[in-house]
């Protein structure tokens, strides 16, 4: 797993990251609204198969400013260790600024007003921001989430 890039409409692909990268399992990808080649990426160091065993995604947020050739962790203000994964990111851009939001499978939402240089906690303890079985794989007591996986 990793991040890939294509310049020919998907006929061929170049690997930008690999399993040894800080984000070996990229999930949320947000392009910068005005700076070409800038992307914010949230995700986990480990893949979902490993989450099932160790209940740890070791997630963070990174940015590339050169189309994926190099990546910088932008996690000041985030917990030192994110057990859950950053599965969703959103951006609100306006003339002269932008706000980034990151949601985790731990049920936390974080906000950055300075392009990821620093983060503040918006809320913790809400329902997990997750898809499919990802939350289930990260939870040490999966029997507690059975009700969350049903539909009314």
What name fits each language-model region?
Residues 1-152:
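Extracellular glycan-interacting surfaces
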């Amino acid at each position: 797993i990793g991040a890939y890039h294509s310049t020919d409409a998907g006929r061929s692909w170049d690997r930008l990251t690999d399993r040894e990268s800080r984000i070996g399992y990229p999930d949320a990808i947000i392009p910068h609204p005005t700076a070409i080649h800038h992307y914010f990426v949230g995700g986990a160091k480990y893949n979902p198969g490993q989450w099932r065993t160790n209940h740890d995604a070791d997630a963070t947020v990174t940015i590339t400013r050169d189309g994926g050739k190099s990546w910088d962790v932008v996690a000041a203000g985030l917990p030192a260790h994110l057990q859950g994964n950053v599965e969703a990111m959103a951006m609100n851009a306006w003339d002269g600024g932008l706000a980034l939001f990151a949601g985790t499978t731990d049920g936390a939402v974080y906000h950055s007003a300075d392009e990821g240089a620093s983060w503040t906690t918006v809320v913790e303890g809400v329902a997990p921001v997750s898809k499919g079985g990802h939350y289930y794989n990260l939870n040490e007591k999966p029997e507690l989430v059975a009700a969350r996986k049903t539909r009314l």
